From Swiss-Prot:
Gene name, Swiss-Prot/TrEMBL: DPB3
Keyword Cell inner membrane part of the UniProt annotation: no
Modified residues (Phosphoserine): 186, 188-189
Organism of origin: Saccharomyces cerevisiae (strain ATCC 204508 / S288c)
Protein name as annotated: DNA polymerase epsilon subunit C
CC per GO annotation: CHRAC; epsilon DNA polymerase complex; nuclear replication fork; nucleus
Function per UniProt: As accessory component of the DNA polymerase epsilon (DNA polymerase II) participates in chromosomal DNA replication. It is required during synthesis of the leading and lagging DNA strands at the replication fork and binds at/or near replication origins and moves along DNA with the replication fork. It has 3'-5' proofreading exonuclease activity that correct errors arising during DNA replication. It is also involved in DNA synthesis during DNA repair.
Length: 201
């Protein structure tokens, strides 16, 4: 029984046909029998398209025995047969997608070759690079003590500057406070003098 069902069932899975049908904005609730009939119709349509494309490919093959169905042969069939003319937009979209895939493949290949070139170039001049590194090391060893001494001198100068700045700021604050204190004392002495004057008479 199961073998009979498999033989009578469509090649396209009914669940996938149902999913594709639900993508249509004008989809209406459809029975399983109608969906299986649609699957059979799609199977017959694809079979007819492939047969027509193969016939045109054989006519253009110029005596080749082995044929391969390509997108170009399907495109030719769509252009020459009126009953497949509605597929022109789909064929254009397929061609765009295949062109993008080819560009991606081409972009991937030059990147690999460029990386290999970058790796190979330093290997050609290994001796020159070693000599240059040795010269740079000698020069840097001679210059390092000078830089260290300069850094030490700079750090000492900065510490001296900081200490003089801090002392100067403390003194200025102290002088400012002392000036305020002097002003307060002078006011208080005036008051005391006034008190003595008031007590004398």
């Amino acid at each position: 029984m199961s073998n009979l069902v498999k033989e009578k069932a469509p090649v396209f899975p009914i669940s996938k046909v149902k999913k594709i049908a639900k993508c249509d904005p004008e989809y209406v609730i459809t029975s399983n029998v109608a969906i299986s009939a649609t699957a059979f119709a799609a199977e017959l349509f694809v079979q007819n398209l492939v047969e027509e494309s193969l016939v045109l490919a054989q006519l253009n093959s110029k005596g080749k025995t082995s044929l391969r169905l390509s997108l170009n042969s399907i495109e030719e069939c769509v252009e020459k047969r009126d009953n497949f003319r509605f597929l022109e937009d789909a064929i254009k979209q397929l061609k765009k997608n295949s062109a993008l895939d080819k560009k991606r493949e081409l972009n991937m290949q030059p990147g690999r070759s460029d990386q290999e070139v970058v790796i190979e170039e330093p290997e050609l001049h290994e001796d020159d690079g070693v000599e240059e590194e040795e010269e740079e090391d000698e020069v840097s060893e001679e210059e390092e003590p000078v830089h260290n001494e300069e850094l030490l001198d700079d750090s000492k100068d900065q510490q001296n500057d900081k200490s003089t700045r801090s002392v100067a700021s403390l003194l200025s604050r102290f002088q400012y406070k002392s000036a305020l204190d002097v002003g307060e004392h002078s006011d208080s002495s005036d008051i005391e003098v006034d008190h003595t004057k008031s007590t004398d008479p």
